[in-house]
Swiss-Prot record:
It comes from Homo sapiens. GO terms for molecular function: DNA binding. Residues 1-51 form a transit peptide. GO terms for cellular component: cell-cell junction; midbody; mitochondrial matrix; mitochondrial nucleoid; mitochondrion; mitotic spindle; nucleus. Interacts with PCNA and POLD2. Interacts with SSBP1. Interacts with PRIMPOL; leading to enhance DNA polymerase activity of PRIMPOL. Interacts with POLH. Interacts with POLD1; leading to stimulate DNA polymerase activity of POLD1. Its main location: mitochondrion. NCBIfam families: PRK05461.1 (NF003967). This is Polymerase delta-interacting protein 2. Involved in DNA damage tolerance by regulating translesion synthesis (TLS) of templates carrying DNA damage lesions such as 8oxoG and abasic sites. May act by stimulating activity of DNA polymerases involved in TLS, such as PRIMPOL and polymerase delta (POLD1). It is found in: Mitochondrion matrix; Nucleus. GO terms for biological process: error-free translesion synthesis; mitochondrion organization; mitotic spindle assembly; negative regulation of macroautophagy; positive regulation of focal adhesion assembly; positive regulation of mitotic cell cycle; positive regulation of mitotic cytokinesis; vascular associated smooth muscle cell proliferation. The keyword Zinc does not apply.
Length: 368
């Protein structure tokens, strides 16, 4: 757990995982450097892929940690399913699924764009489609390898005490889309190193996968459901840069005789082209139900100006926003720079900030 510090951004490594597995024969051995978190598919009859020297610690050798399974085209992965993240490259385990509404503006029916309006920016109407995401634990051994490129993911909560702005985090907890999961099996009874793994999951060799939910996991999920729930996902692509936004409601606090509502939002930027680009600026418009419209401009995101290349095509981070109203909207643009110095703007899909008006008190810590 100590290896996964409570930071809120996650840079992404190469896409070579998904490329190297295309057309593969299943099952395939899954290998890692002993004590390390970087993986490589083991050899087949035609190809052999090893860890690169930049990722493999000096003196470490590859060892088999599991066998890849065929990814599910239909249906859901069960609690206890081990997986490799196809984009981030970390080992993880599925805790439970979320059924989200995916609003994908790339597949929306072509409609005349409308002028921007304070309710959230006009543009084409998008219908939500049900899509499966998963709450997962990240293997602590892999966090240092992710953080070589950026920072590791954590889920943040409002602290339940006098400081209305205080946050606490659960490191190594993430949300993963169904298509990002590369499932594998392992004979290890504790294949994932995370402080919560053995608290949440019990080894049962008669089951498939051989890890079942403990009562502590079910109780924790029920207790913290309002603050963990993933309901809406928004996605849009501009000039081969895809932006995915997932908002989460965190709760309400009273400050100076007024109510302050808090949200967390997670953003993933993906370069779908081979050209190298760098994020330079962000430009946000934040509309509150109270009638205020705020503009926020700044350099980069979370103190970084990430480069998106063919080798490292994606970057993910989380941030927070508060309003003195129970709902609102956010939208905006990211400005990217090409190697020749030219710039282009990438749209951030508009998303709603909705609160739960019959909410209970947000959690003050880990509830079992």
């Amino acid at each position: 757990m100590a290896a996964c510090t409570a930071r809120r951004a996650l840079a992404v490594g190469s896409r070579w995982w998904s490329r190297s597995l295309t057309g593969a024969r299943w099952p395939r051995p899954l290998c890692a450097a002993a004590g390390a978190g970087a993986f490589s598919p083991a050899s087949t009859t035609t190809t052999r892929r090893h860890l690169s020297s930049r990722n493999r610690p000096e003196g470490k050798v590859l060892e088999t940690v599991g066998v890849f399974e065929v990814p599910k085209q239909n249906g859901k992965y069960e609690t206890g399913q081990l997986f490799l993240h196809s984009i981030f490259g970390y080992r993880g385990v599925v805790l439970f699924p979320w059924q989200a509404r995916l609003y994908d503006r790339d597949v929306a029916s072509a409609a005349p764009e409308k002028a921007e309006n304070p309710a959230g920016h006009g543009s084409k109407e998008v219908k939500g489609k049900t899509h499966t995401y998963y709450q997962v634990l990240i293997d602590a051994r892999d966090c240092p390898h992710i953080s070589q490129r950026s920072q590791t993911e954590a889920v943040t909560f409002l602290a339940n005490h006098d400081d209305s702005r205080a946050l606490y985090a659960i490191p190594g907890l993430d949300y993963v889309s169904h298509e990002d999961i590369l499932p594998y099996t392992s004979t290890d009874q504790v294949p994932i190193q995370h402080e919560l793994f053995e608290r949440f999951l019990l080894y049962d060799q008669t089951k498939a996968p051989p890890f079942v939910a403990r009562e502590t996991l079910r109780a924790w999920q029920e207790k913290n459901h309002p603050w963990l729930e993933l309901s809406d996902v928004h996605r849009e692509t501009t000039e081969n840069i895809r932006v995915t936004v997932i908002p989460f409601y965190m709760g309400m606090r009273e400050a100076q005789n007024s109510h302050v509502y808090w949200w967390r939002y997670c953003i993933r930027l993906e370069n779908l082209d081979s050209d190298v680009v760098q994020l330079r600026e962000r430009h946000w418009r934040i509309f509150s139900l109270s009638g205020t419209l705020e503009t926020v401009r700044g350099r980069g995101v979370v103190g970084r100006e990430p480069v998106l290349s063919k080798e490292q095509p994606a970057f993910q981070y989380s941030s927070h926003v508060s309003l003195q109203a129970s709902s609102g909207h956010m939208w905006g643009t990211f400005r990217f720079e090409r190697p020749d110095g030219s710039h282009f703007d990438v749209r951030i899909p508009p998303f709603s900030l909705e609160s739960n008006k019959d909410e209970k008190t947000p959690p003050s810590g880990l509830h079992w």
